[in-house]
Amino acid sequence: MMKFTLIRPPVLMPTFNMADLVVPPIGPAYVAAAVRQAGHEVCFIDAISLAIEQYTPRDTGTLMHGLAIPAIVDRIPEDTGVVGVSSNFSFEWPVCRELLQAIRARFPKTLLVAGGEHVTAVPEFSLAQSPLDVIVLGEGEETMADLLRVYEQGGIGQLSTVPGLVYRDASGQIQHTAVRPRIADLNAIPRPAWDLLPLEEYLSRGYGFGVNRGRSIPVLASRGCPYQCTFCSNPTMWTVRWKPRDPGDLLDEIADLQREYQATNFDFYDLTMIVNKQWIIDFCHGIEQRKMKFTWQLPSGTRSEAIDDEVSRLLYQTGCRNISYSPESGSEETLNLIKKRVSIPQLLKSMRLAVRNGLNVKSNFIFGFPEDRWKNLWETYRVIVRAAWAGIHDIAIWVFVPYPGSELFDQLRSEGRIQEMDDAYFGRLAAYADVTQTYSYCRALGRKQLLGARVAGTFLFYGVAWLLRPWRPFRILINSISGHLESRSELAVRGFFKRLLKGWA
């Protein structure tokens, strides 16, 4: 048995971030559960929950949310055999690298491992830029358990037998092991080890990925996404195979979380939960048959094809209150270029039905793809107006940033548009959520034009939406003050005033 320390690093966010998304770390919690089931002792250091009200300004104009790096290192047991660090979002890599350097300084002989979407996308870069020894590619549960078993028995020299790794061998050379297949049976994966971290810090504040609707815990109903959008890095992490869990097994987990943690709301972190219409119908019928009572949300974005009148009615009847669509663009030309398979007429019809059946609906758009022109943005503006007319409650307009592991990132690298993956580049990645900063990777539109287009699109949507439904801004203000949140705009307003009162903004 080995002692394994798993760390979720502090989170970086722009000072003028659109909203505070303080979420329990479901990915590391899954890995911790698998390692514990394999017989190892796990020390879980979640830097967010251990200092959930701590925000540290950085020279880059960002805030670091969570425990300071020296305090994290102080919590690592002296007799730990392996330290694992989660590295998901590329814009947080500078903090992750700083943490890894501090760990290596304190533990010069301890094996350092990282997993997550960022290091999976650029494993050689991550090894070259940090003191990491091993990178776990893709899904980490089985790979991490195998790594610890083999390392305990034979040291780093035996890691070549573990599929799904990139590592430095004893001579310092980078080695790739065999590709590990996706986990076949999602129902057999042990549930997240929430007992290893102070989950109550999130629950008591209603923190989660979605709107604050009480004591929220994240769950996953599926893994992977069958689509290949060129701006997305998920195919590198998950491949393009969508695999759902058994609805009954998922409902068993939800029932257990209600009983153990008095959870009242569940945020589904799936990349694309609603792909198969029959699956979501079976899930909703299962809630009804068991007479379960809870709210749930789909904050990541979902497909419109399967959400018709029947499905949207079932969603609301079984407690779903918030869903998000992610068409990204209203331009057919842009949609084809980014390989976004979405029908705008079907999307708008689905939006109308969702609103009619009581759901709170948000839509996500992205401006500034490399080939975008004003013509494409005007086409998107028309869809934004039609979405407001359909009655949806919120939109978010992001500016495109090229994430490592995505097709567009590789294209821009080959064209010389991304010359160095330095800290300035990673800082530009964080600007996607900053309401004051924009960086352009678009050939035809500059930074100021995209910033203006983003602001104009936001005002256009809310101007039309509130003109048609003039009571909504008053509800947003009242709910933001009271803390009884129903929409993402209320979450954003409340988060902004929270930062303002603390003197961040």
Question: For each of these PLM feature ranges, what is it?
Answer:
Residues M2-T5, P10-A19, G61, V162, ...:
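N-terminal [4Fe-4S]-dependent radical SAM core
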Residues K3, A34-D185, G405:
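Glycine-rich beta-alpha loop elements in corrinoid/cobalamin-binding modules
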Residues F4-L6, Q37, E41, E78-D79, ...:
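Radical SAM enzyme core and accessory elements
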Residues R8, D46-A51, T236, F365-F367, ...:
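Residue-level recognition of beta-strand->loop/alpha-helix junctions
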Residues M13, A51-E53, P123, Y227, ...:
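Flexible glycine/acidic-rich beta-alpha junction loops that bind and position SAM and/or redox cofactors
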Residues V22-V35:
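Short catalytic helix/loop segments, enriched in acidic residues and glycine
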Residues F125-T143, L314-N322, E379-I397:
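Structural recognition of alpha->loop->beta junctions
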Residues N187, P192-K362, F369, W374, ...:
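Radical SAM [4Fe-4S] cluster-binding motif and immediate context
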